[in-house]
Amino acid sequence: MRIILLGAPGAGKGTQAQFIMEKYGIVQISTGDMLRAAVKSGSELGKQAKDIMDAGKLVTDELVIALVKERIAQDDCRNGFLLDGFPRTIPQADAMKEAGIAVDYVLEFDVPDELIVDRIVGRRVHAASGRVYHIKFNPPKVEGKDDVTGEELTTRKDDQEETVRKRLVEYHQMTAPLIGYYQKEAEAGNTKYAKVDGTQAVADVRADLEKILG
């Protein structure tokens, strides 16, 4: 089973990716992890990626596609894989298709921007332990304090409203067009496309995914 997850940052993809991996025995391929692993392995592609990143440039689509192809040929991808954070643009989706990388399901997590802002901006973190709270959905027992240690909670830079809104604008400009792209692919019989209501409780989203994926 080969799956692509689409949806804005904060739409709940990460939580559900864990569930899909465990239930269906497939691995998650995150382009960030893949690039780091390739650089560490010192492979030919890894060296190319390192040179580009060391120069402060963005890794080209061609190189990422080559890395994806190399990664999915590995043994642990036998049952399938889950692509997270790729493709981000239509040229990347086209390049994947040209490289012969077929996908069984494209799942879109649909959540309105304002709810995403609410979800992310309300997060509070206990830096030392990694415990995450939410002022509305999962508040600490004492406001602003970690339940276990009583230490101060902080807001990550990535979780500040300005940053979140900027990421949403980028998502709508670059990645949202993929929704139309993959709907057309599904109409042509090349993949299956499903829209998931990401505003629901985690367990309800999970139940929807089980219905879709079987």
Curated annotation (Swiss-Prot):
PROSITE patterns associated with the record: ADENYLATE_KINASE
Catalytic activity: AMP + ATP = 2 ADP
Region listing for LID, in residue ranges: 122-159
Localization in the cell: Cytoplasm
GO annotation, cellular component aspect: cytoplasm
Keywords from the UniProt entry: ATP-binding, Cytoplasm, Kinase, Nucleotide biosynthesis, Nucleotide-binding, Transferase
GO MF annotations, alphabetized: adenylate kinase activity; ATP binding
Record: residues binding ATP: 10-15, 123, 132-133, 200
CDD domains: ADK
Region (NMP): 30-59
Gene3D superfamilies, alphabetized: P-loop containing nucleotide triphosphate hydrolases
EC number assigned by the record: 2.7.4.3
Pfam families the UniProt entry points to: ADK, ADK_lid
GO biological process terms on file: AMP salvage
Family statement drawn from the similarity comment of this UniProt entry: Belongs to the adenylate kinase family.
NCBIfam families, alphabetized: adk, PRK00279.1-1, PRK00279.1-2, PRK00279.1-3, PRK14527.1
Function noted in UniProt: Catalyzes the reversible transfer of the terminal phosphate group between ATP and AMP. Plays an important role in cellular energy homeostasis and in adenine nucleotide metabolism.
Name of the protein: Adenylate kinase
UniProt source species: Citrobacter koseri (strain ATCC BAA-895 / CDC 4225-83 / SGSC4696)
Lineage, broadest ranks: Bacteria, Pseudomonadati, Pseudomonadota, Gammaproteobacteria, Enterobacterales
